[in-house]
């Protein structure tokens, strides 16, 4: 629970969420331009990359927040963690993409995507934490 006033906490989450959603949209557009629409229609590369990057950044954030005072932690956790990274990463899109692959008759791709997404997300989070412990 936050120590910030409820309105202030809500505004931090809302602002961060808007920023994160725009960043996710722009990264998806950039990846489509970089890899091409055919590659993006075969495998959800953008969602995989976004969720892995978001996990890395969450690990960095967690490592940094650990060193801050509780009041400062709350503001940055709500703005960046819940807001920006919550708006940036997307578990609902991941779930839909897995199911679409299953419906297309591609259960092996679906399984690969699940394994890659979970292992990359956890590995990226741990790497982010290790970076902050190494450099902070």
From Swiss-Prot:
HAMAP family: FluC. Na(+) binds at residues 86, 89. GO terms for cellular component: plasma membrane. The gene is fluC. Pfam families: CRCB. One of its GO terms (molecular function) is fluoride channel activity. GO terms for biological process: cellular detoxification of fluoride. The chain crosses the membrane at residues 3-23, 46-66, 78-98, 109-129. The lineage of its organism: Bacteria, Pseudomonadati, Pseudomonadota, Alphaproteobacteria, Sphingomonadales. Belongs to the fluoride channel Fluc/FEX (TC 1.A.43) family. It is a multi-pass membrane protein. It comes from Erythrobacter litoralis (strain HTCC2594). Na(+) is not transported, but it plays an essential structural role and its presence is essential for fluoride channel function. It catalyses: fluoride(in) = fluoride(out). Fluoride-specific ion channel. Important for reducing fluoride concentration in the cell, thus reducing its toxicity. InterPro entries: FluC. It is found in: Cell inner membrane. This is Fluoride-specific ion channel FluC. NCBIfam families: crcB. Coiled coil: none annotated. Keywords: Cell inner membrane, Cell membrane, Ion channel, Ion transport, Membrane, Metal-binding, Sodium, Transmembrane, Transmembrane helix, Transport.
């Amino acid at each position: 629970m936050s120590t910030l006033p409820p309105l202030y906490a809500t505004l931090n989450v809302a602002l961060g969420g808007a920023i994160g959603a725009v960043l996710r949209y722009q990264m998806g557009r950039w990846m489509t331009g970089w890899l091409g629409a055919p590659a993006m229609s075969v495998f959800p590369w953008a969602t995989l990359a976004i969720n892995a990057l978001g996990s890395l950044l969450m690990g960095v954030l967690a490592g940094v927040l650990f060193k801050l005072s509780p009041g400062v932690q709350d503001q940055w956790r709500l703005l960046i963690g819940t807001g920006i990274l919550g708006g940036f990463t997307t578990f609902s899109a991941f779930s839909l993409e897995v199911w679409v692959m299953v419906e297309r008759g591609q259960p092996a791709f679906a399984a690969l995507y699940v394994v890659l997404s979970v292992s990359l997300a956890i590995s990226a989070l741990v790497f982010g934490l290790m970076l902050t412990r190494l450099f902070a």
